[in-house]
Curated annotation (Swiss-Prot):
<feature type="binding site">
    <location>
        <position position="320"/>
    </location>
    <ligand>
        <name>FAD</name>
    </ligand>
</feature>
<dbReference type="GO" id="GO:0050660">
    <property type="term" value="F:flavin adenine dinucleotide binding"/>
</dbReference>
<feature type="binding site">
    <location>
        <position position="279"/>
    </location>
    <ligand>
        <name>FAD</name>
    </ligand>
</feature>
<dbReference type="InterPro" id="IPR023753">
    <property type="entry name" value="FAD/NAD-binding_dom"/>
</dbReference>
<comment type="subunit">
    <text>Homodimer.</text>
</comment>
<feature type="binding site">
    <location>
        <position position="87"/>
    </location>
    <ligand>
        <name>FAD</name>
    </ligand>
</feature>
<dbReference type="InterPro" id="IPR022890">
    <property type="entry name" value="Fd--NADP_Rdtase_type_2"/>
</dbReference>
<dbReference type="InterPro" id="IPR036188">
    <property type="entry name" value="FAD/NAD-bd_sf"/>
</dbReference>
<keyword id="KW-0560">Oxidoreductase</keyword>
<keyword id="KW-0274">FAD</keyword>
<feature type="binding site">
    <location>
        <position position="47"/>
    </location>
    <ligand>
        <name>FAD</name>
    </ligand>
</feature>
<feature type="binding site">
    <location>
        <position position="119"/>
    </location>
    <ligand>
        <name>FAD</name>
    </ligand>
</feature>
<comment type="similarity">
    <text>Belongs to the ferredoxin--NADP reductase type 2 family.</text>
</comment>
<protein>
    <recommendedName>
        <fullName>Ferredoxin--NADP reductase</fullName>
        <ecNumber>1.18.1.2</ecNumber>
    </recommendedName>
</protein>
<dbReference type="GO" id="GO:0004324">
    <property type="term" value="F:ferredoxin-NADP+ reductase activity"/>
</dbReference>
<feature type="binding site">
    <location>
        <position position="34"/>
    </location>
    <ligand>
        <name>FAD</name>
    </ligand>
</feature>
<keyword id="KW-0285">Flavoprotein</keyword>
Length: 322
């Protein structure tokens, strides 16, 4: 017979992991379902060595350190974890039935913490770019790029942050953006301008050259100009953001705003017993930060527990009193 859980969480990224931990503090029986082969979400898989600067009480920590800390926090509790499972359907009711690519699950309440859904890097759209093994979309071991010539493409937080990280160990670091202004946090952009990183704007990549499976140079055209630019490198890093897919989200019967799940101040969706937190949810004024999602997790858990036990207060004891 299928076991029925108090709270099932869809998504094993930072927000989902913290929601699971907090649910255990409320003595809930918890399950996590994630489509990836490991827990941790984007920070663990796509930028394990990238510094994250907006987690309270941590001046800086990497994606892997954040994941390790969250897993250590969760470790003392008995959490059922299902990996490589993708949610395909939700059947609401007193007991909610979840259908995945591997079977069915039953739960009393559901917290969706799936981020932007399945994700993959936006590719460098140059013929043959995927044939070179030194064209990268994420960093798994930054020390292997010490004393190398590095070129970074992009203008957002990842591109700027990685450029600043490479500056500390690389022989040379250059960043190229298609616009004059960067989209990264103002403090990071100012730090970039004060660094030894060479900045080229606004340029659009046009071609790669190399041999034996390794690229050695990239050509650019300057926007609204006849100027050309060619840069040689040992490694090229593409930071154009990510494409995400929400799969069958539209078929789950939840109110959506574009591709996000509409929630109220209790993190409740339009379906009783189902909550959404993190980047997958929408409300007016929503800010997409890990820190924001971490704050939404206790709200969802406490209201889920109140849904299960209407006579109990939504506001629980503080952890300092446990």
């Amino acid at each position: 017979m299928t076991q029925v859980y108090d709270i099932t969480i869809i998504g094993g990224g930072p927000v989902g992991l913290f929601a699971a931990f907090y649910a255990h503090l409320r003595q809930a029986k918890v399950k996590i379902i994630d489509s990836l082969p490991q827990l941790g979400g984007q920070p663990a898989i796509l930028y394990p060595e990238k510094a994250i600067l907006d987690i309270p009480a941590f001046p800086s920590l990497t994606g892997q350190e954040l994941t390790d800390n969250l897993l250590a926090q969760l470790a003392p509790f008995d959490t059922t974890i299902c990996l490589n499972e993708t949610l395909t359907a939700i059947e609401p009711g007193e007991t909610i039935t979840l259908t995945t690519n591997k079977g069915n699950h039953q739960t009393k309440t559901l917290i969706i913490a799936m981020g932007g859904g399945a994700f993959k890097p936006r590719p460098l759209e140059i013929d043959g770019a995927d044939s070179f093994d030194n064209v990268h979309y994420h960093v798994s071991n930054i020390q292997q790029y010490a004393d190398k010539d590095i070129v970074v493409l992009g203008g957002g937080d990842s591109a700027v942050d990685w450029s600043l990280a490479f500056e500390k160990i690389a022989k040379t670091t250059q960043i190229i953006h298609r616009r004059d202004n960067f989209r990264a946090l103002e403090h990071s952009v100012e730090e970039l301008k004060q660094s030894s990183v060479t900045i080229h704007t606004p340029f659009i990549p046009k071609g790669l050259s190399g041999e034996n499976g390794r690229a050695s140079a990239i050509d650019f055209d300057k926007v609204k100009s006849e100027d050309k630019l060619t840069l040689s490198f040992d490694h090229l890093f593409v930071n154009y953001g990510f494409k995400s897919s929400v799969g069958t989200l539209k078929e789950w019967g939840l109110e959506l705003n574009r591709h996000r799940i509409v929630v109220n101040s209790k993190q409740e969706t339009s379906v009783p017993g189902i909550y959404a937190i993190g980047d997958c949810c929408f409300y007016e004024g929503k800010i997409d930060l890990i820190a924001t999602g971490l704050g939404e997790a206790p709200t969802a858990v406490n209201n889920a527990m109140n849904y299960l036990n209407p006579n109990e207060k939504v506001q629980p004891k503080h952890s300092t009193s446990l």
